[in-house]
Amino acid sequence: MAEHPPLLDTAQILSSDISLLSAPIVSADGTQQVILVQVNPGEAFTIRREDGQFQCITGPAQVPMMSPNGSVPPIYVPPGYAPQVIEDNGVRRVVVVPQSPEFHPGGHTVIHRSPHPPLPGFIPVPTMMPPPPRHMYSPVTGAGDMATQYMPQYQSSQVYADVDAHSTHGRSNFRDERSSKTYERLQKKLKDRQGTQKDKMSSPPPSPQKCPSPISEHNGLIKGQNASGGNTGSARNRSGRGRSCTQVDPEMEEKDEETKAFEAFLSNIVKPVASDIQARTVLLTWSPPSSFINGEVNETAVPELFNYEVLVSSTGKEGKYRSVYIGEETSVTLNDLKPATDYHAKVQAESNSIKGIPSEAESFTTLSCEPDPPNAPRIANRTKNSLTLQWKAPSDNGSKIQSFILEWDEGKGNGEFCQCYMGSQKQFKITKLSPAMGCKFRLSAKNDYGVSDFSEEVLYYTSGCAPSVPASPVLTKAGVTWLSLQWTKPSGTPSDEGISYILEMEEETSGYGFKPKYDGEDLAYTVKNLRRSTKYKFKVIAYNSEGKSNPSEVVEFSTCPDKPGVPVKPSVKGKIHSHGFKITWDPPKDNGGAPINKYVVEMAEGSNGNKWDMIYSGTTREHLCDRLTPGCYYRLRVYCISDGGQSAVSESLLVQTPAVPPGPCLPPRLQGRPKAKEIQLRWGPPQVDGGSPISCYAVEMTPADKDEPRDVYQGSEVECTVGSLLPGKTYSFRLRAANRIGFGPFSEKYDITTAPGPPDQCRPPQVTCRSATCAQVNWEIPLSNGTDVTEYRLEWGGVEGSMQMCYCGPGLSCELKGLSPATTYYCRVQAMSVVGAGPFSEVVACVTPPSVPAIVTCLQEISDDDIEYPHYSPSTCLAISWKEPYDHGSEILAYSIDLGDKQPLTVGKMTSYIIDSLQPDTTYRIRIQALNSLGAGPFSHTIKLKTKPLPPDPPRLECVAFNHQNLKLKWGEGTPKTLSTDAVQYHLQMEDRNGRFVSLYRGPCHTYKVQRLSESTSYKFCIQACNEAGEGPLSQEYVFTTPKSLPAALKAPKIEKINDHICEITWEYLQPMKGDPVIYNLQVMVGKDSEFKQIYKGPDTSFRYSSLQLNCEYRFRVCAIRQCQDPTGHQDLVGPYSTTVFFISQRTEPPASSNKDSVDSARTRRTLSDEQCAAVILVVFAFFSILIAFIIQYFVIK
């Protein structure tokens, strides 16, 4: 409410949303001072004059006030604020600032707030203080005495990036060093006075009130004595730190610390800055959330991009906010705002579906502008000579509407308008008009910012006389029970004049005259519920507010007739003939109000036929149906046609014509070529079946030299074979068909001549066996049937049903050679002529005499796996098998095996034999022949077989490497790289707990590692060698014993410094190993020594080393020793040493530097952690696994 002080930044004051009071003290002489109260534009200051009346002074203005005692009087401020006296270049100013730790530099804005109440330090405050003045404009109503309360608007240049250069009245503000220090002291006092800590950067300062007071709103602006207090209360409720109105959100308590920290980071966002404020647009900019919270750096991971949501409210800071923007940009231009309206904007940050608390609200007010376009004026009253128009005021957009401008076209209708009224009234009466005169009007509003756009154009008419006689109604469409009528306006009637019409109707037979059927403003009407085919008279009367017109001329229209009813089902008149019949029918019972014009008869063929053909159309009610097919079904129906339309079809009549015998068939035809004794005939059905299906055919044959016909076929088939004919004879055939009525006429005759016949069947041939492999066949000449025999065919075979032709020629005998002894053969003979081949003779069987056996086949070696002979040795034996040959009629008695140089072997009747007593690794040529009582058969094919060498002896087995779990065995003199294709294979076996030897390894390698054994345990092994000759003998039993296991490697020892010369080394404890005690050996290497020295050996797990030297480097390591008690005596098993630990002795510093000593001590105790040791072991294990896999791949598989 006063001038912005130079000490406190204007942007800081404005961001707190309070009204300011700055009272510059003009004279500081200590007696009487004049205090100037600066009232900012848009604000008001209430004082009480000497006469006791209250006066409201609106800004911009300076109000001089006198201080009688020379001191600065107390300034009344609302709750949550405090007055501060600041001296600037000899001028003291009273500044109202908020009591909040949140009073910090922020965004820039312009605030128009409600004025403060009167200052009690200057004027007495009565009991009944009038309420402070309301806001000086309202964009909603736009009416009233707004001119006296108009508030000048700020321009967009009021928002600056440099706060020090901001001044409301254009005066430059300055800040010297003294004022800066004063400002810092003021900020510190405000924070100390507040006494509370803020939860988040976005939370407003706490309020001394328990609950926020109700906030009223007018035109989107907050009013009340302390709008900031309401905002504070709401923010405290959100953060859960209010006193009596506190609400705790249970979901916030369940969130983890990381989510809470990230929400706090997102909530640390500064309120947006409003710039470039126009009447309907504003530019909002903001910055991403800051990583500094309460002066500390937030270690929460900051994402690269944020999503921002801009919330805007026009109903006050505590009003309802709506989202106007969601995106990743840090600036947005808001459009479609209301002019001269207070808005409050917040921004809310979001990332990974986590939202922060919205920022503080940035308040701004849009600029005023010209009014909105008003609505078109409405007609309030009209007469024949005047029109009275009314209208409503539009939104004034922040400036009171000064006048309205009403224009009209003077009734000319040429589109040119002139002003007929300008003033502040909201109605106007235009006089001196003509009756039924049409005028166009438009309206605009004007304020201090200009003239609005014109409203829509409207056309209004003055009142006129009663309507003239309208034209007669016209029939547009007629139906059976309705008539659609249409009429026009009377001539010369204005288009906007409200005219109603009365439609009257008269029915000829009613006798009641005309009756109204319609009364309204429409120009068309459909009269319903009329009778069909009836005439009606109509007339129309027009009327308005001035009276009724004369009725129009009477017109007459008729409704349409209805379609007739369904005719009666047609019936047959007289007898039904095979080719026609007569039908008749009766007219429908209802003709639809019009005479029947014609009847239509339709007919469909078949009992279920749907293809209807029209066969009659006329006025008579009977019809002769002719040219029909006998024995066929016909369906007939009838319908009638009148002026009202076509009726539905009647029920169908089903009629069947009587059947007749079928018509003549076409002569039968020869199918294929005629044969000597039979012919094949085929025919088709007759063209006319007589109305009944063909059930039978009859074929009649007559020889050419005889006149005695006879039936050769009767049946339903369309083909037949006529046999028992003579070759070269002529025969006549004719055909007839029959149905259920009877046979039809014969067809024409068809002559066919048979072909010449082949020779007759020969008599059975005679077979004479000359030897076991040769036979003679003889036959006789058969009857030739009129043609000479040209050749004979002899078929011969060992199976009766599968004989092959072995001779073809004119001879009467044939000699067959190459026959099998003691075999049954079959033969037959056939004679042929130029006509064809005669039938074969009967089959004759003969048997050839016996002979020596046939050749032996399938001679082969028997596999070793298939031999079950216990004394078989592949080195001295050969096993052969063969297939038994044909014995040729004499039983096989024995077989002779030829081995080449050796004497042939004679064996009994068998098909396999093992030849023994052979030389190892020797090749033999073997063949075999069969023997019977008639002699020896031919030798079989020769095969070459070779005996295998003798199996090898077992190698010597020895143990080349061992530990407590593994034994590496070696045998033979093989090279390390042994191929899997080596001839010699080795089979290693080990004795199990049950005393049985189990297989460990079978392959060509000469070494094998036995794993997962028990320590200090004896195991028995044996081995045998194998090659293609077989498995060699087992070796003797070898006994190998595993040693005891060594202790495991210890972790790196821990070193703790006792003083400058003593340190304590500790290490982990190992459990006794299977009853054997464990002791420890501690070694140290001092300085640049190259060897470790033992400093302790015993069962303890710690040792104090007291020979430390200052600034000297020590290396410690420790190992475990297992003390074994064997029957042979005492034995120590030393385990691997632990990781070496480095230690540097340094002088102990005073206690003040205890932190540094702890750091140095920590540095001297750098050892590998358990995780690092596990990682190293895992890497080593992986390396050795890969190496072993490579060795197996290279030496074993390849």
Curated annotation (Swiss-Prot):
Matches recorded under Gene3D superfamilies: Immunoglobulins
Matches recorded under Pfam families: fn3
Disulfide-bond pairs as recorded: none
Topology class, membrane: Single-pass membrane protein
Positions of post-translational N6-acetyllysine modification: 384
Keywords: Acetylation, Golgi apparatus, Membrane, Phosphoprotein, Repeat, Transmembrane, Transmembrane helix
Compartment(s): Golgi apparatus membrane
Domain Fibronectin type-III: 268-369, 373-465, 469-562, 566-660, 664-757, 761-851, 863-950, 951-1045, 1049-1151
Basic and acidic residues compositional bias, start-end: 188-201
Annotated segments matching region Disordered: 188-257
UniProt xrefs under SUPFAM superfamilies: Fibronectin type III
Biological processes, Gene Ontology terms: cell-cell adhesion; fertilization; Sertoli cell development; spermatid development
Tissue: Testis. Localizes to the acrosome of spermatids, as well as to Leydig cells. Can be detected on the acrosome beginning at steps 2-3 and continuing until step 12 of spermiogenesis.
SMART domains attached to this UniProt entry: FN3
Biological role stated in the UniProt entry: Mediates spermatid-Sertoli adhesion during spermatogenesis.
Name used for this protein in its record: Fibronectin type-III domain-containing protein 3A
Origin organism lineage: Eukaryota, Metazoa, Chordata, Craniata, Vertebrata
UniProt gene name: Fndc3a
